[in-house]
Regions:
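Short gly/pro/ser/thr-enriched loop/turn and capping motifs at secondary-structure boundaries
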Residues: 95-102, 120-123
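Iron-sulfur (Fe-S) cluster-binding modules
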Residues: 1-65, 76, 80-88, 107, ...
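Short glycine-rich anion-binding loops that position phosphate/pyrophosphate groups of nucleotides
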Residues: 69-71, 95-97, 170
């Protein structure tokens, strides 16, 4: 008798959908997935209902790949529900792992976000002063929408996470790695980062590295780069020195700097702080005014340093309220 199929769920919280597409990017391996697993819940692809999840027994699902951050009360509710129903919970992709790009919203308050989105937005009709509310009574019923939290949180802030699969989105090889590990019963220790390396991206990058001293910082489109030389040495801010390896150096090999989506390298406590330190250390000047001018060329320090990990940073660790 054939082994029973794995019972699998996939879900997106505050996310863009790229992680779901990454599952399909496994190409013909998706046919193997269909042979060994039943996908019981996947909102981006199947019209499942929360009631279907609620009706399942606790632990009925073998595996959940949860992508996306926790931005509102619905995200948290479904995360907690899937945690109860799943034997293995995986934070899948940068947003679930670290908070991701949605986490950059933590640089503004909820009130500032609402003001910009609903009151001071150039696309709004003049005179529109509508703000969202969580409850609205209409003729026949009361409508409810999720509560928008004050902060974006990573998945591990609200539920216990067994494994982490980094990337924006994860590479197809990582998707295969986590599925095969479950199928073969070869899961690593709880808390492991699956399908990624144990070094920095710089360690795997083959670009030539010389002395890192720069007089100005540039964005990729502002210069004609040397395709063989370290991007950071050319004044193009690259996060490879502080980022976990495992992506195959896809961005630098394509002429684009590493953005840091695989999260902090092993032994890096705060990826953004380490990135700021690395950039500051290569400024070729001792004159305070010149240093200020050079650093001032970086258009968005927060975005460069904490593009994917602000909710997981030490800057956020004192913030507990949802």
């Amino acid at each position: 008798m054939a082994d029973p199929k794995l019972q699998v769920a996939l879900y997106w919280g505050a996310a863009c959908g790229g992680c779901d597409v990454a599952v399909l990017d496994t190409d013909e391996f998706i046919l193997t997935v269909a042979e060994v697993a039943d996908i019981r819940f996947w909102p981006i692809a199947v019209d499942g209902k929360y009631a279907d999840l609620e009706a399942m027994d606790d632990g009925e699902l073998d595996l959940t790949l949860f992508n996306g951050a926790i931005r509102n009360s619905e995200n948290q509710y479904v995360a907690e529900l899937l945690r109860r129903k799943s034997k293995v919970m995986v934070a899948f992709g940068s947003c679930a792992h670290l908070g991701g790009i949605p986490g950059l919203a933590n640089d503004a308050s909820r009130e500032e976000i609402f003001h910009r989105a609903y009151l001071d937005n150039p696309s709004l009709e003049e005179g529109n002063v509508t703000l969202p509310v969580t409850e609205k009574k209409v003729a026949s019923c009361t409508l409810e929408i999720p509560r928008f939290y004050r902060r974006v949180h990573k998945l591990a802030d609200v539920v216990a996470v067994d494994y982490f699969v980094p990337g924006c989105p994860p590479a197809p090889t990582q998707v295969k790695a986590v599925l095969l590990a479950v199928v073969q019963g070869a899961l690593p220790p709880i808390g492991s980062v699956v399908g990624a390396g144990e070094r920095t991206l710089c360690d795997e990058c083959e670009r030539r590295k010389e002395e890192k001293k720069v007089k100005r910082f540039q964005r990729p489109w502002q210069t004609i780069q040397d395709p063989d030389r370290c991007l950071l040495e050319q004044g193009i801010i690259c996060a490879g020195s502080v980022t976990r390896s495992g992506c195959g150096v896809r961005c630098p090999d394509s002429g684009m700097p590493c953005r840091g989506c695989y999260g902090p390298a092993p032994n890096v406590h705060d990826q953004g702080a380490k990135m700021i330190s690395a950039v500051a250390s290569i400024v070729d000047s001792r004159d305070p005014d010149e240093i200020a001018t050079i650093i001032g060329e970086i258009p968005d320090v927060m975005g460069f340093a904490y593009r994917f990990g602000l909710p997981a940073s030490t800057l956020q660790q004192s913030v507990r309220s949802l």
